[in-house]
Amino acid sequence: MINIEKVKREFDMYVSNFDKKQGRIKLKIEHIERVAKISALIAKDLNLNEEQTILAETIGFFHDIGRFKQVEMYDTFSDKDSVNHAKLGTQILFDENLIEKFDIEDKYREIIKKAILNHNKDRIEEGLTKEENLFCKIIRDADKLDIFYVICNYDFENAFWYKDFECESISEKIMNEFKSEHKINYKDIKNNADEISVPFAYVYDLYFNFSLKYLKERQYLTKYANLVCKKFTSEKVHEQTMELLKCILVSFHQTYF
């Protein structure tokens, strides 16, 4: 079984190589620690055993391990402007053998690798084992849940790469995709107003009832919508944001939100 206390110690040792006082480094450390906790909560809610719960928590600590090098090398969290942080993370862990410091048994390694590689994809790849697929779902949900926390509690400019809060509107293409398909094509995102739709679309990509309840209890969707309306200056953007929120409420018949 994985020694989760050793995982925590070695994670702390690894991130000590970076400037923890730097805003984005600090943000990412805190995000990773929360995602690990949420992953364990999801596993427990699914009645997984102790070994599986610890594995889920461990994946939480590893899922964004590539972010630190990404910021150091490219000064951004934007994959499109740098590198795929999930692939970078697996290179650091497995190709550069950082994984050896954590004393992770071989039987867990492929599950961990698949979970990291799939946590930031549009959808989980096909051909995975049942166990690999399960842990991919857990980390994807846990990551999205804490992204809402980050959005609602950190500056947009620091947490992401929002710079322009004067965009006039979310594109009609994005709005139509969201309302008709309950998803968006990331290639269609052209500006920061279009980016607004991304967290809303996350809701349709959550796998577990626990995750929907978690969002509701913390009122993240309403908080996010209100924050967007506070940050962006365009009345059109405000209207569209509330339209996206309403679409979610209708879709779920307000069962959760």
Feature locations, PLM:
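Generic alpha-helical secondary structure signal
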Residues: 2-5, 9-12, 50, 87, ...
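Acidic/histidine metal-binding catalytic segments
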Residues: 47-58, 99-117, 131-138
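A broad, low-specificity signal for short, low-complexity segments enriched in glycine/proline
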Residues: 18, 100, 109, 158-165
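Divalent metal-dependent phosphate-bond-processing catalytic cores, especially two-metal-ion Mg2+/Mn2+ enzymes
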Residues: 23-29, 33, 37, 41-49, ...
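Acidic/His-rich, divalent-metal-binding segments that scaffold phosphate/diphosphate chemistry
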Residues: 1-87, 129
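A generic short-segment signal for beta-strand/edge and adjacent turn/coil regions
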Residues: 3, 25-28, 80-85, 104-108, ...
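Hydrophobic/aromatic-rich structural module bridging two neighboring secondary-structure elements via a short loop
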Residues: 68-111, 122
